[in-house]
UniProtKB/Swiss-Prot annotation:
GO terms for cellular component: cytoplasm; nucleus. InterPro entries: Adenylat/UMP-CMP_kin, Adenylat_kinase_CS, P-loop_NTPase, UMP_CMP_kinase. Residues 141-149 are annotated as: LID. This is UMP-CMP kinase 1.
Amino acid sequence: MAHANKNHIESFPPPGKKITIVFVIGGPGSGKGTQCAKIVKQFGFTHLSAGDLLREEAKYDTEQGTMIKNLMNEGKLVSSDLIVKLLFKAMRESGNDKFLVDGFPRNEENRHAYENIIHIEPEFLLFIDCSKEEMERRILNRNQGRDDDNIDTIRRRFDVFQQQTLPVIQYYEKRGKLRKVDGNRQVDEVFEDVKAIFAQLNNQKIHGGQQASGLSRAQMNPLKRWFFDFFCGCFGTKEEARN
């Protein structure tokens, strides 16, 4: 796998292409991964997980892959800059223009690195809000074979989430970019709310595209209006062409 580098950052997105990015945040056991899978299926987003990208990169026998593997084995954090560059590289190579970034930004350092490197404003941050009690119950009940699914480790993960990720959530809330859903319910009930949020995003993009497509006849200067009327008189409007 090629390294994420400056050239990747500079060449994406292509000129004139609109990229849609949504962050998805939730505590351990909140069900955000399940909701991401449903969003991908319903709305055609590409699902990106910082953790998955790091684990994938660590498989390669390269200087960067070895460094990531060693840091992860030692329980140390990988630099935010590297995480962001891996995310951006994955976006560039995906061929899609809509991305769900799962579990990111995890902290304020992640957020700053994203803003400094990528320069694409997220549409919003989707927060799957779930109580500690419900998340704990789900993690203990699931059978994923994870070594860290014991009560003490689970509670430490909750504490880390509270301390590091809540400031990120508050940041986007102040900017009017927080979309929060109640994650304590059944999967399909949660997705009804999630679906409504993404349907609204789709509608905004459709209307935005129509507004950006050109001036109305009344907004044109007289010369442009004359050409517009001449064209429509010769070839008919779109509505006439359909009839």
